[in-house]
Amino acid sequence: MDKKRYELNVQLAQMLKGGVIMDVTNVEQARIAEDAGAVAVMALERVPADIRAQGGVARMSDPSMIVEIKKSVSIPVMAKARIGHFVEAQILEALKIDYIDESEVLTPADEECHIDKTRFSIPFVCGARNLGEALRRIAEGAAMIRTKGEAGTGNVVEAVRHMRTMNREIRQLVGMPVEEVTVFAKSNGIPYELALQVRGLGRLPVVNFAAGGIATPADAALMMQLGCDGVFVGSGIFKSSNPDRRARAIVKATAYFNDAAKVLEASLDLGEAMPVLEIAQIPEDQILATRGW
């Protein structure tokens, strides 16, 4: 992928800014998401809550299912590939989907290497818990970053932690003497020029969305007020008692995140949210956010 193609991919991801991307498992859910105002859908066979509950190896979704969803909506369609599984990514690119998410929600295929995203023309989304992770993924060719909040829990605490960590580390980099940027880049395994770019911008050079544990309009508005550019919602919509209403509510809260009255309106009469899983109760080997490096 040449520089112009990468810049185009970054611009494509910028077009999703301020919007909500929803996980969907079938055509009906995809249409609900589109009608609710989602800017894109993530096509997958099982939402994170089901992946967590059922266990086993989670792989790329059946391509035929992705094709059916792609045919059913006019908004962009994303799909997940396992960390390091570049052949799954090749298949998804051949399907001509709009974005690939190299996702820790699926079982990693490679415990040493992430996908070299510069070998692809399609934009990639990657998760990050901190600035170092984000910049390593961008150096590999990611056009979009998201938090790695603990998916399938309905608990936003980890996404908040990741965003606050990212914000704090960017502030530290901005205030760093230029001669220390080399040390920062070396210690985080990233190109010096990329670290210098972030120092100058005061933010990541790509969009950074919230993901993981977002279940309510208030969760979405919280992440936007913390500085996220948009929101991914996985299990939070279709594991709730009224998916259609909740989908519309989260879209509204994301758009009007700084208007408490609008967020209040969005929060009324939604029915039951998805059940919440306390992070401390999850066995260490089942924590998804620690996958990747």
Curated annotation (Swiss-Prot):
InterPro entries membership: Aldolase_TIM, PdxS/SNZ, PdxS/SNZ_N, RibuloseP-bd_barrel
GO biological process: amino acid metabolic process; pyridoxal phosphate biosynthetic process; pyridoxine biosynthetic process
Residues annotated as the enzyme's active site: K80 (schiff-base intermediate with d-ribose 5-phosphate)
One protein family per Pfam: SOR_SNZ
Biological pathway: Cofactor biosynthesis; pyridoxal 5'-phosphate biosynthesis
Catalytic activity: aldehydo-D-ribose 5-phosphate + D-glyceraldehyde 3-phosphate + L-glutamine = pyridoxal 5'-phosphate + L-glutamate + phosphate + 3 H2O + H(+)
Function statement: Catalyzes the formation of pyridoxal 5'-phosphate from ribose 5-phosphate (RBP), glyceraldehyde 3-phosphate (G3P) and ammonia. The ammonia is provided by the PdxT subunit. Can also use ribulose 5-phosphate and dihydroxyacetone phosphate as substrates, resulting from enzyme-catalyzed isomerization of RBP and G3P, respectively.
Subunit and partners: In the presence of PdxT, forms a dodecamer of heterodimers.
Name of the protein: Pyridoxal 5'-phosphate synthase subunit PdxS
